[in-house]
Amino acid sequence: MRDRRNNLAKLNTLVFGRDLRITKGEPYPHIYEYDFSSYYPEENYIYNQDLPEGKEIFDIRFYGADVRNDDNALFIQKAVDDAAKVGGCVVVSGGNYVTTTVFLKSDITLFIFRDSSLSSNKTGEGYNHLGIVHCDSCRNVTLTGGGKLIGNGEYFGRKPLYDKNIIEHSEYIDVIEMRKKYRAQLRFAHESKYGGVLYIKNCTDIKADNFIIENSAHWSFHIENCNGVEIKNFVINNNRHVANADGFDISGSSNVSINHCFVSTADDGICIKNALWLGNTNEMKNISVSDCEVISCTNAFKIGTETTFDISDVTVSNCRFFMTDIYPGTVSGIAIESADGASVHHIKVQNISMNRVTCPVFIRLCNRNRASTVDGSSANAVEFGKRKKRASSAAKDRFHQKGSIYAVDISDVTAENIEIPVIIAGYKQNEKSFYVSDVTLKNFNLQYAPYKEVYDKRRFIPEYVDVYPESWRFRNLPAYALWTRHVKGLKLLDFVCGVPRSTWKEEIITEDVI
């Protein structure tokens, strides 16, 4: 164990919550070694594919698209418009085509051959945060072919604090040091950032099969207010240090399946959100994730943090969550959060393997109540490199203390090289406790990374009621297997955690658990 913290280390602890963020400087397009994962199994997910039979073909080259053009949007859009009249297939073949936003329409197939791609420009002009491919109020749209959408993410982030990525683990397990080094490697947004790569909203019956997104500058594949989305054989391969580059973001949508996909990204791998400021208005349900590999610097699978409206009936199964090459590892493998008033319930997770995931499971109910401080414009300000603005109209009481988490069943989890315990926490505010309820953890086998522990024993652990929920928020907890607070109906069945090296911590700590 490390000696007790000296005065400098204590000061570092006090400023732990400060937001290390680079806010000045021009875009920095240089790619560091290990920005992209060395493990990239494209051949396991993507295959050579023939054009669909029975569909009329609309090749973008026939409309004037050329790999030498600075912007092919007009030519691609004309092909889309004509294909939509007959339910045709828009074909991208013969190389990489730079384009500003292309708007898909109902009843078409976008087919990008495996050797071809559509890519963003390197200025960010011409997108209006709509992404490279945008699909609004459409039905019956298919994306396929084995080709790519390329986001050129590094052209829209500032130089990170560090001049190279960290690949060696610290001598100690220390959450404070992890967070500092993680943020020092991030490329925070320049104001030129255009948005994500693929954005579908208000759509029904969408299919994406045999498709690649590469190097997004923001959310890679955003699914907003949709019903009936099927994604399989899909690859997202991003720069792991471009801030806010999520993999899949599902917001306000129901009946969505993500099957047999690979994600390597800087921010959340697969994320479910449902929030007022995202333009969501209804509950969302019936989301399934299966047979996926996820490399994420933050959370491999996450519900949250944006959660004003209810989320239920979510299943995650047969997945592998892990980190390669760089330090620190993934923040959390499974994160289930209600921060802004949503009821999150009937969540089932089973058969998950993890390696180099700092916190295997993080379940957190709190009262951030973000709808009282932001609207759609202000919520995006920081993410797009602009000054944070307060919302013009606040919904202070609408979602205050309304959130809940219950009926969570997680089973058959194997995790190697973890660094902090499973965390389950409700909150206490104004002398009233709000509980996470009815959680079952079954067949867990957790093993610690072989490093020394920092000694960080505190007299009390704050509630952190109204701040951003993250497993790192609680810092170096005094339990190594499980730390719980404000929980009702917790069941542990065959829950095993190996004892970490020379630990000073207790195995399990329960506080206000009934």
Predicted regions and their residues:
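Extracellular beta-rich repeat passengers
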Residues: 307, 326-514
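Right-handed parallel beta-helix
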Residues: 114-115, 139-148, 204-215, 227-239, ...
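Extracellular "leader-to-stem" segments immediately downstream of a signal peptide or signal-anchor
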Residues: 1-109, 113-202, 207-209, 218, ...
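Short glycine/acidic-rich loop motifs that flank beta-strands on beta-rich extracellular proteins
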Residues: 100-101, 121-123, 129, 152-156, ...
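Alpha-helix capping and helix-loop boundary segments enriched in small/acidic/polar residues
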Residues: 67-70, 245, 249, 258, ...
